[in-house]
């Protein structure tokens, strides 16, 4: 899936730009996907690259969408020492978008919680994966 990063960045709304380009954080419980339950794929709002699946989403009660793991190598982790804290930042590899942070207080075997800003994501419903060019990810929902 080809994209023009500069053009896509120009089309972002204020919150999407602040989060993805300026490492911002949207307000908890006041964002699009924190309690979203539909089956599908969460992709990078800038590049369109798949990041997370609804199968790995869980209710962490933190006010942001939370996932136990990314679906492929598109997610990078970097040390973040901003705001007087030591955290692990999560960024998209292709667009270098700030997505959120990963913490070691999650459920499941890996114990991770990927706390992601909704503004960094676009949701593609399972029934539209083929239509939008994500057909190769349909197998993730058959497990």
UniProtKB/Swiss-Prot annotation:
The keyword Ion transport does not apply. GO terms for cellular component: cytoplasm. GO terms for biological process: protein repair; response to oxidative stress. It catalyses: L-methionyl-[protein] + [thioredoxin]-disulfide + H2O = L-methionyl-(R)-S-oxide-[protein] + [thioredoxin]-dithiol. InterPro entries: Met_Sox_Rdtase_MsrB (IPR028427), Met_Sox_Rdtase_MsrB_dom (IPR002579), Mss4-like_sf (IPR011057). One of its GO terms (molecular function) is peptide-methionine (R)-S-oxide reductase activity. Pfam families: SelR. Residues 5-126 form the MsrB domain. This is Peptide methionine sulfoxide reductase MsrB. It comes from Bacillus subtilis (strain 168).
């Amino acid at each position: 899936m080809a994209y023009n990063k500069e053009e896509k960045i120009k089309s972002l709304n204020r919150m999407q730009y602040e989060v993805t380009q300026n490492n911002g954080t949207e307000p908890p419980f006041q964002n699009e996907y924190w309690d979203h339950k539909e089956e599908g794929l969460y992709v990078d709002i800038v590049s369109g690259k798949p990041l997370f699946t609804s199968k790995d989403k869980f209710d962490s009660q933190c006010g942001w969408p939370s996932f136990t793991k990314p679906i492929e190598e598109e997610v990078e982790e970097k040390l973040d020492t901003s705001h007087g804290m030591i955290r692990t930042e999560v960024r998209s590899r292709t667009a270098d978008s700030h997505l959120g942070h990963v913490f070691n207080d999650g459920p499941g075997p890996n114990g991770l919680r990927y706390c992601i800003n909704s503004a960094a994501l676009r949701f593609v419903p399972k029934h539209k994966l083929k239509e939008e060019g994500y057909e190769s990810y349909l197998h993730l929902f058959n497990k």
